[in-house]
């Protein structure tokens, strides 16, 4: 809900009224293995309900990460597969933007092997990503992760491409 643009949520850290949940039941997508949280968010947006981000470190809920890289990948594929049922225009737009940007970044990194000018595109993206990530990492007391941003920015486009095509 930051910037009045809610596109993601996590059921472990989501608060809503019983009335909204009851009203949304016929709108949640039964054909998907998971995703009630996202589909509930889409419903609330559709009915012009109020969505806010509670920016308080004490409000964070920690959940267990996947045990293995394989389990992590399967979880992401499952999340990606439910995107076929998304009807929220903002969410679909951002998903397409992330996918197309990832394809562009992967192609530019490969092209940089032959022409170093393509590194400039990666550097621009790194600066933009850092400007978005660093304030959150500082706020959430995860400053130690800042040093991983350059390394992960190289891997991330390929991870997104694999996940998108694995989940479709």
Residue ranges, per PLM feature:
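Membrane-embedded multi-pass helical conduit in multi-pass membrane proteins
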Residues: 94-168
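Catalytic donor/gating beta->alpha subdomain of glycosyltransferases that bind UDP-sugars
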Residues: 1, 19-22, 27-91
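Low-complexity, charge- and small-residue-enriched intrinsically disordered regions
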Residues: 1-6, 164-168
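Tryptophan-centric aromatic hotspots in well-structured domains and transmembrane helices
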Residues: 9-10, 79, 159
């Amino acid at each position: 809900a930051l910037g009045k643009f809610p596109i993601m949520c996590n059921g472990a850290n989501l608060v809503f009224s019983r009335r909204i949940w009851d009203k949304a039941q016929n709108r949640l997508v039964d054909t998907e293995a998971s995703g009630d949280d996202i589909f509930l968010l889409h419903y609330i947006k559709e009915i012009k309900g109020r969505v806010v981000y509670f920016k308080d470190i004490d409000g964070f809920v920690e959940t267990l990460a996947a045990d293995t890289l394989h389990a992590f990948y399967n979880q992401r594929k499952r999340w990606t597969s439910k995107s076929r049922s998304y009807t929220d225009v903002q969410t679909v737009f951002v998903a397409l933007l992330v996918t197309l940007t990832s394809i562009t970044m992967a192609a530019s990194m490969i092209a940089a092997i032959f022409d170093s000018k393509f590194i400039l595109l990666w550097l621009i993206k790194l600066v933009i990503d850092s400007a978005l990530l660093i304030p959150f990492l500082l706020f959430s007391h995860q400053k130690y992760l800042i040093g991983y941003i350059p390394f992960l920015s190289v891997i991330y486009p390929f991870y997104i491409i694999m996940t998108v095509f694995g989940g479709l």
